[in-house]
Curated annotation (Swiss-Prot):
This is Large ribosomal subunit protein uL24. The keyword Ribosomal protein applies. PROSITE patterns: RIBOSOMAL_L24 (PS01108). One of its GO terms (biological process) is translation. The keyword Transmembrane helix does not apply. The lineage of its organism: Bacteria, Thermotogati, Deinococcota, Deinococci, Thermales.
């Protein structure tokens, strides 16, 4: 059984370790099989592309590469600090992701 990724698409995260330590960005994609996330503006790599209708000249394009999920920490919308994730049950039985520091919800209510 594979581990669950503690962040979701759209979360604002802080990179906690590595070359990009201290950078803040929004999660563009989550790759659960690789236990990785793609964060906007972080871990940019240059990729060679062939000529196509989208890139008529071809050449090199900068794009985000995946980071291991353990390197990022979600930023709590309530207290504004990077935090670990706890699971919490609401009165109606739903399970949500909660901030380990203040107990506020990390899940956006729809």
């Amino acid at each position: 059984m594979q581990a669950k990724v503690h962040v979701k698409k759209g979360d604002t995260v802080l990179v906690a370790s590595g070359k990009y330590k201290g950078r803040v960005g929004k999660v563009k994609a989550v790759l659960p099989r690789k236990m990785a996330v793609i964060v906007e503006g972080v871990n940019l790599v240059k990729k060679a592309v062939r000529p196509s209708p989208k890139h008529p000249q071809g050449g090199f394009v900068e794009q985000e590469a995946p980071l291991h999920a353990s390197k990022v920490r979600p930023i709590c919308p309530a207290c504004g600090k990077p935090t670990r994730v706890r699971k919490k049950f609401l009165e109606d039985g739903r399970k949500i992701r909660a901030c380990a520091k203040c107990g506020g919800s990390l899940d956006v209510e729809e």
